[in-house]
Amino acid sequence: MAAIKADLDARSRYPYEIAVENWTHDFNIGSAVRSANAFGASRVHIVGPHKWNRKGALMTELYQHVDYHPSIRELAASWRYRIAGEIAAEQARVNARIIRAQSRHRPLSADEQHQQTQSAHRLDTLHHAKIIALDILPGAVPMERYRFPERCLLLFGAEGPGLSQAALDQADDVVYISQFGSVRSITAGAAAAVAMHSWVAQHAVIEGPGAASESGSSATVHR
């Protein structure tokens, strides 16, 4: 079990995360966790009680990084704090390379220039990180027209009540899934799967002829 989790960490986690509000012991939470495993979410956050309906997860939670939070406000604060810490650490690496080059009285080497380019991309990604709420609300952006940032935290509500006002207050953007039939909504679990796959469709580079290998599809993130 630990080996499988480590392998997923090494080769197929993506930098987006998801959070689910657990106020109604909703069976869709397990479905969302299962989809997070399938679509390579780096972390799953459960907001509310630690006890949640695991039936739909089919034990995939054992291979995910699952964190628990007492409130959506605490989750948002800790996520933004972590992003700020990564920005500071990356900027420190950039500055250190420049200082080393100046101390040698020579320009950056080709390898250092490449590292600076990679750092610039990481910093740009971090500066554009967002918390995104998935809900059908006035002013929300249709998912089909929305460009997900590479680093993001996707917020999903419980079946029925949807996201709490506290969650919506923490969101940078609100996105909804366009629907065209007589039904006015889809399940929270289905919505989570659609949103995660939309992120993958925008950011993942699927290697090979388009078929999954025996151990799953091989993919990387656009750089």
Where is each model-derived feature located?
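Post-transcriptional modification and biogenesis factors for structured RNAs
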Residues: 1-223
